[in-house]
Amino acid sequence: VELEVLGLIAKYGSIRGLVNLHGLVYELQSRGVLKTDFTFIRYSFGYYSKDLEELLSTLRKLELIRVRRSGDGTEVVEITEKGLRVLEAARGFKEGPMSRV
């Protein structure tokens, strides 16, 4: 699950707004594109998942993602260099050592 979300953030480079990230994960999970099982609640501002928020907090503490404020105050979620290395290592592990021979 962590790698699914990390990979999503890496794919987009950065995602403007945590609300947008929650909405994107909700849509992709609903369509079966993301293999996650977050529970979402619909609010007036969009979909929100406490589970996803906790995962994002963990990813931040592990320094795999960062959330910064843009000039207009919007939160921007980005993958860090460390996050990219973890993602690459995990993808290489999934492929197996013989796949590169």
Task: Kindly give the residue locations of the regions a language model identified.
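Domain-edge interaction signal
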Residues: 1-101
